[in-house]
Amino acid sequence: MLVDIHTNLMWYPDHMSDEFVEFAYAAKRAKMRLSPDVYYAAHEDKYKNAFDSTPEALLEATASCDKVVVFGLKAPYCGVDVPQELVADFVRGHQDRFIGWCSVDPNDADCVEQLEYNVNTLGLRGLKVAPIYQNFDPQNPKHLPLFKKAEALDIPTIWHQGTSFVRPGPLKWANPILLEDIALACPNLRMMIA
């Protein structure tokens, strides 16, 4: 069985800012190796290098997969903001292969309520967070209630804990050791690092 655990549903201009597209284009011009199936790596138009992953492109790129986890990043700090209803609607139309996960910005005052809505109302089954894209310190105790809620809901969490082409993204929040406090405080929270 082939499972793709990390796919995105988002496209320009609906979910990405012009600034994000400029950063993506600069990364491409710097010879960053991207998948031409989803990310238009060979295209010279900067707006085609926006990391577009439309429903059609996602279906085509994952055709050989038995199961696919898909999410739409909620990271307005760096210029990406995907409505979680978009992911839920897409998954409802492709339940045979796709598993929808949500993304919540831990900086939002109502992030715990957003997570509950995404899981209990929309039916999304995991949480995607990205400190470098969302500009949050995983060690800050103010974020712990979100991960306690994910643990209580018994959903897995995937972390983008690596570098990025997005210039405003603080690399200091991408160090995996920063997740230790959450792991200790939430011993039953399943965490994956991407």
At which residue positions do the language-model features occur?
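Helix-coil boundary/capping segments in enzymes
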Residues: M1-A194
